[in-house]
């Protein structure tokens, strides 16, 4: 084995189940993998540990961490061939960390399980949506973390997305969503709301998931839209409204132009809309490009039901 290539799909974070955590666990959440954009990392044999390409410095830092965590000796040359845009709500940091860790581990002949990958990459201690969409693709629901326990949240459910459901992404040119210390500080300022958490759980269990399982896009989309507003209300004191300032009008536009469901991924500013069929997707994408008027980009994507792909050369 002289090289390993890992391709990891982006993810849309659809919301948290319990933002502050009134029970024994905190956060919990759900999200879905999309086939574009993607992070593609290649690791090849080398005497030294080096990296090149977009986000090379971050990939190199991850490689150093995972070598120590997994007890890997020797070098590797890491090439970041493609990178998900950073801080727009598509999970760029997690996917880069997991893909780099998997590439370095596989090059060394190791096949760590998902929890070992997350631990070595230093990911998944708050939200495990990025981890489970990386491993499995599709739509995932995770159960939250116990306070003081440094372990990714357990996977509660995973379902494949229908092949004929399409997703339109609108990524406006705007201030990036929160990350790093600013994100950590934001979570300390949130307050518990048991009523909202109960409504979110009810919506996921009795409408969103049943709608997905029965391939009822109307039910799924309505539940998704309502879920996004409930979650957004919890974060409104932090982000200045139910959605990122640049995202609010775009969510309304998605719904007004025919999306069955729409919302903001993570802290934004990326907005997404779900439709049935490629033709409807192309039409919505064209109309959303007019809404952005050059102030960002729009992409029609498919849902990814496979998760990360690992190719050994």
Where are these regions (language model features)?
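Small/polar glycine-rich anion-binding or flexible loop at a beta-alpha turn
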Residues: 247, 265-272
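A structural signal for short secondary-structure junctions
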Residues: 34-35, 72, 255-256, 263-267
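Short, flexible, solvent-exposed loop/turn segments with mixed acidic/basic and small polar residues
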Residues: 40-43, 259-265
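Glycine/serine-rich anion-binding loops at beta->alpha junctions
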Residues: 82-106, 126-134, 262-266
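ATP-dependent small-molecule kinase catalytic core of the GHMP/sugar-kinase superfamily
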Residues: 2-7, 15, 21-25, 113-257, ...
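ATP-binding N-lobe of GHMP and related small-molecule kinases
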Residues: 1-88, 92, 105-114, 305-306, ...
């Amino acid at each position: 084995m002289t090289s390993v290539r890992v391709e990891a799909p982006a993810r849309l974070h659809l919301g948290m189940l319990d933002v502050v955590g009134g029970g024994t666990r905190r956060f919990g959440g759900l999200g879905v993998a999309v086939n574009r954009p993607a992070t593609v990392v290649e690791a090849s044999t080398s005497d030294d540990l080096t990296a090149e390409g977009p986000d090379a410095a971050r990939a190199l830092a991850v490689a150093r961490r995972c070598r120590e965590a997994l007890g890997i000796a020797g070098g590797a040359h890491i090439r970041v061939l493609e990178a998900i845009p950073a801080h727009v709500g598509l999970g760029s940091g997690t996917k880069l960390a997991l893909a780099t860790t998997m590439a370095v581990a596989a090059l060394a002949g190791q096949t760590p399980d998902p929890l070992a990958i997350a631990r070595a990459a230093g990911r998944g201690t708050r939200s495990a949506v990025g981890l489970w969409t990386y491993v499995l693709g599709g739509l995932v629901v995770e159960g939250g973390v116990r306070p003081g326990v440094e372990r990714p949240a357990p996977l509660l459910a995973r379902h494949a997305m229908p092949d004929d459901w399409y997703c339109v992404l609108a990524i406006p040119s705007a201030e990036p969503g929160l990350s790093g210390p600013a994100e950590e500080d934001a979570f300390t300022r949130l307050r518990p709301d048991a009523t909202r958490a109960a409504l979110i759980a009810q919506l996921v269990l009795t409408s969103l998931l049943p709608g997905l399982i029965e391939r009822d896009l109307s039910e799924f989309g309505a539940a998704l839209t309502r879920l996004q507003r409930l979650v957004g209300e919890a974060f409104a004191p932090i982000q200045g409204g139910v959605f990122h300032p640049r995202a609010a009008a775009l969510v309304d536009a998605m719904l007004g132009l025919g999306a069955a469901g729409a919302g903001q991924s993570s802290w934004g500013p990326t907005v997404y809309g779900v439709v049935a069929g490629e033709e409807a997707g192309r039409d919505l994408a064209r109309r959303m490009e007019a809404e952005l008027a050059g102030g960002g980009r729009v992409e029609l994507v498919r849902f990814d039901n496979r998760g990360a792909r690992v190719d050994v050369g």
